[in-house]
């Protein structure tokens, strides 16, 4: 009876290991590809791949090492984008400047929307286009959104009203694109999958 029990335990263990091998193999390929991207300085792609690897089997060594890489890369990428967005930005509308359909909601009332970004805060202003008088509308602390430790999202911020905005820059770092991707409510985070509110800002020299 005792030998039969030991045999069943060993059989079960071997079955579990066999079932998990494909996952470990896939995790290993994601990790190795992430390392390759990291060495090529493709940090955004590396972050995405390390994130995937960390979620496959978070309890093993590759999973633990991957989550460390995720944290390191998030910090690195956030510093990089922060260094570029510090300064003043004028809101252009809901589409890129080159788009023929771009609309600037400020054109009709003689008011420009301006944001000033520093290391800790975002200050929102209204500027009279005629008098150039600047009025502070609100101030938001910069708080990065982190749903999960292993999440690859590094440039999303959450505002005091619960809206979550993903931020990105163009190659020249003179156009800031923000898009409302979700909203945090009492019931949790609700993703916005269609008709997302977008804004484009141009850097003010």
PLM features: what roles do these ranges have?
Residues 24, 94-101, 119-186:
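Contiguous, well-ordered beta-strand patches that form the walls/edges
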Residues 81, 95, 110-127, 205:
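Flexible low-complexity loop/turn motifs enriched in small/helix-breaking residues
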Residues 100-108:
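Surface-exposed strand-loop-strand hairpins of Gram-negative outer-membrane beta-barrel proteins
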């Amino acid at each position: 009876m005792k030998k039969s029990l030991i045999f069943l335990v060993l059989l079960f263990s071997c079955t579990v290991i066999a079932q998990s091998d494909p996952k470990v193999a896939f995790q290993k390929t994601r990790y190795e590809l992430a390392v390759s991207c990291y060495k090529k300085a493709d940090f955004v792609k590396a972050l995405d791949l390390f994130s995937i690897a960390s979620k496959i089997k978070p309890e093993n060594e590759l999973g633990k090492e991957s989550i460390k890489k995720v944290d390191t890369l998030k910090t690195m990428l956030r510093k990089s984008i922060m260094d570029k967005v510090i300064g003043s930005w004028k809101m252009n509308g809901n589409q890129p400047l080159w788009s023929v359909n771009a609309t600037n909601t400020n054109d009709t009332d003689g008011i420009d929307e301006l944001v000033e970004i520093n290391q800790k805060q975002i200050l929102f202003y209204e500027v009279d286009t005629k008098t150039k008088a600047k009025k502070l509308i609100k101030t938001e602390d910069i708080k990065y959104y982190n749903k999960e430790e292993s999440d690859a999202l590094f440039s999303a911020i959450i505002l005091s009203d619960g809206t979550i905005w993903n931020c990105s820059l163009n190659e020249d770092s003179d156009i800031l694109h923000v898009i409302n991707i979700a909203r945090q409510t009492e019931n949790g985070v609700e993703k916005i999958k269609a008709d997302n509110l977008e804004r484009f800002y141009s850097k003010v020299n």
